[in-house]
């Protein structure tokens, strides 16, 4: 029952915040909970969902290459500007943080609750996008490790 109340609260916050992605995600999870025998599928979705999401995002990012909107000239041009180098550096940093984030989420489930709350606040109050829980977890890992803190 508690999970339904929590999901309903998330749905209300998403509706109030006009965040269609969070509304859709919450409704999908609620529908999955309603369907008999899906309890065994939920852990699979939880475990593999981030990878599936990254795959979908990667496909979307590669489409301009496939359509010819982005080519090698654009790639070389990126290395000619400071902004291009910063973008490459941030891409590397995000990949590294995500690696630690995935490990952190698996090792310390309590982090998930705080990250979900932070993500909801960021999405609803600041019109952010819920694309960063793994990165946020990686950042949490780095700060917690740096400050020698524990959950």
UniProtKB/Swiss-Prot annotation:
Main location (coarse class): membrane
The answer to whether keyword Heme applies is no
Keywords, in A-Z order: Cell membrane, Membrane, Transmembrane, Transmembrane helix
- Report membrane topology: Multi-pass membrane protein
The membrane-spanning stretches of this chain are: 4-24, 52-72, 77-97, 115-135
Q: Which residues form the signal peptide?
A: none
InterPro entries xrefs: UPF0756_TM (IPR007382)
**A Pfam family matched by this chain, by name?**
DUF441
Does the keyword Amino-acid biosynthesis belong to this entry?
no
Q: Superkingdom of this entry's organism?
A: Bacteria
One GO cellular component term of this record is:
plasma membrane
Q: Where in the cell is it found?
A: Cell membrane
The similarity annotation says: Belongs to the UPF0756 family.
Instruction: Supply the name of the protein.
Output: UPF0756 membrane protein Lreu_0946
Species name for this entry? Limosilactobacillus reuteri (strain DSM 20016)
